[in-house]
A protein has these predicted regions:
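Basic amphipathic alpha-helical segments that dock to polyanions
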Residues: 59-61, 65-66
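Short secondary-structure boundary/capping segments
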Residues: 20, 64, 80-81
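Amphipathic alpha-helical dimerization/coiled-coil segments
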Residues: 96-119
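Short, intrinsically disordered or compositionally biased N-terminal tails of bacterial proteins
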Residues: 1-15
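Accessory beta->alpha helical hairpin/"wing" motif in late/C-terminal subdomains of nucleic-acid enzymes
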Residues: 91-95
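N-terminal helix-turn-helix DNA-binding core of bacterial DNA-binding proteins
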Residues: 16-58
Length: 119
C-alpha cells in the first residue's frame, strides 16, 4: 500500500512539473509584454508577487532558451541603474505571436476543464 501511495505522489509531482513548465513560459511572456522590458530578478519578484515561487535556476535558462528561439530579445543596460549592468528582456514580434497562440490554447484548455467539471 505504501508503494502505491509513494508512486502516486511521484506521479503527481511529475504532472505538476510538466504543467508548470508550459504555464511558467506563458506567464513570463505575458509579464514581459505588460512591462515592455524586464530583467531576471525583477521577473522573479513579479512572479513571486502572484504566488508563483520560481527559482533562479529555472527562470534564467528559460529566458536564455526563449531568447535563442527568437521569442525574446535581450539587451544589457547600465544607464540610470545603480550597481551592475542588467540584462533586460523584451518580446519580439514572434514572441508576441507565440504568446497570442499560447494564451488562446490555454484559455481553451481551461474552458474545456471547467465544462468537464460541470457534467
Amino acid at each position: 500500500m505504501l508503494g502505491i501511495v509513494l508512486s502516486m505522489a511521484a506521479s503527481t509531482e511529475n504532472w505538476k512539473t510538466q504543467i508548470r513548465k508550459g504555464y511558467l513560459e506563458l506567464c513570463i511572456l505575458l509579464l514581459i509584454k505588460r512591462q515592455g522590458k524586464v530583467y531576471g530578478f525583477d521577473l522573479l519578484e513579479r512572479l513571486s508577487a502572484v504566488s508563483l515561487e520560481v527559482k533562479e535556476g529555472t527562470v534564467y535558462p528559460l529566458l536564455n532558451r526563449m531568447n535563442a528561439d527568437g521569442l525574446l530579445s535581450a539587451t544589457w543596460e547600465t544607464e540610470n541603474l545603480k550597481g551592475h549592468p542588467r540584462k533586460f528582456y523584451s518580446l519580439t514580434k514572434d514572441g508576441s505571436r507565440f504568446l497570442g497562440e499560447m494564451s488562446q490554447e490555454f484559455e481553451q484548455m481551461v474552458s474545456a476543464f471547467k465544462k468537464l467539471g460541470k457534467e
